[in-house]
Amino acid sequence: DPLALADQVFLFKRTIREVAIRKNMYATFMAKPMQGEPGSAMHLHQSVVDMASGQNVFSNAQGEATEAFFHHIAGLQTYLPAAMPFLAPFVNSYRRLSRFSAAPINLEWGYDNRTCGLRVPQAHPQARRVENRLPGVDANPYLAFAASLGAGLLGMQQQLRPTEPLTGSGYSRPKKLPRHLDDAVEELLACTPLHDLLGHNFVKCYAAIKETEFEEFFEVISPWERRYLLL
């Protein structure tokens, strides 16, 4: 139940923050709080269950992957770049998505391949699922779940086809994700299927907020710029 799980994630974050304060500490759910260290993620393991039978629609009676499984992966590959403002909602979120940092840089998919944006874990057929490794721990769980499941749903509805599974390193492939929040918002605004799915007014309002946040960030001159470019 994605809604119940989102409730649990929200409650967990609030609880951790409250306990930390009581111990005279601060807990952060920033995606990339420390330079040179891996960031903090919120990987989503997702599958689709038939409401009538309780069966995982990603596996058939013989235990093999179904067409719906591959359509779902293709939907993630197609629509997650435009959904990035929900998975990586802040300017800091994109610092986490770099090579050799236990975080993805593209939407290649592979079997038990942790260098890919989309990983298919080794599992029993009834537990067949896709791990979306893009979301950071700073993401709103309700929005991240809705965007990720929605992208997979669009792939199933449109019967999209995924790329071939990657057997090598995803870090050797080109970057295919927005590099910062401003680019991500532009992709979201251009993606009509996500607008139809999530609601035009909601997407327009959310994008406007994120554009404002990025503009405020962009006006700040960083210490790095002063150190290397001032003189």
Residue ranges of predicted features:
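Active-site capping/gating regions of soluble enzymes
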Residues: 3-166, 170, 174
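Acidic, glycine-enriched catalytic cores built around paired aspartates
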Residues: 170-231
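A broad detector of the eukaryotic-type serine/threonine protein kinase catalytic domain
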Residues: 1-2, 193
